[in-house]
Amino acid sequence: MSFGIITGILGSVVGLVILAYCFKNAIKFKNNWYQKKMIKQNIISIIHSSNSSLLSLAGDNTIGLTTHIEFIKSYDKLNKDKDIHIILHTTGGALSSAEAICNCIANHTGVGKIIAYIPYYSYSGGCMIALACDSIVMTKNAILGPCDAQKSNFTTQYSIASVIDTVNYKKQNNEKIKEEWLANSYDAILCKDRQRKYVEKLIQCGHFTQDIGDKIYEEFFSGKYNHDKIFSSADSINLGINVQIVDEMPELIKNITSDI
């Protein structure tokens, strides 16, 4: 191969690297600009969409540690005496991270209310976050999904309820139980208890009445449905959740979610 060809290839590679670097920084600049704009408008977004040029708080694909940390950073900069707007468009993620965000919302002591906006969907951990807010604004076609925690291995995902039920069934029928399943069932029991206590916390702080809180736990957290079960805005209202149904999102929210 001639020196000229090698030089040409190296030049192309360097050009691509520079182009990628510039693109990455352009996205970062745009995100920073959006974040500053949203802070001024008392908005936090948790948006996980491959179609969106506006990445979530830090570019996570699901709710994770980075989302949690960036949420807290954004929350600390907001005006607590005005209503805080949280835009949710996510399939969920890590329970611990979603729970940490929920605790931040539950511990809010400012005069302003915390309002969740769901233009399309908010599943699992995203639904948990919505339920922690003072009210939820949804379009008539927007949906929520169950919040029951999931266990997974390399090939399959299980609800914690199914892990517990499977182990109990095997015990009752004197069937051999793999050590892995025993360990998972113990972890699942602790996780289920943790989610029950989370709902009780929302009840005790006056977020829900005991009756409504029990219904919410049964429908969203108990694992009685498949994890892909959907709850419409009307279903949510029927459960006693403070949901406002709108034909379209407020202009302030639409400006941010237009590219989802």
Model region roles, listed by residue range:
Residues 1-117, 121, 137-139, 150-260:
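N-terminal organellar transit peptides
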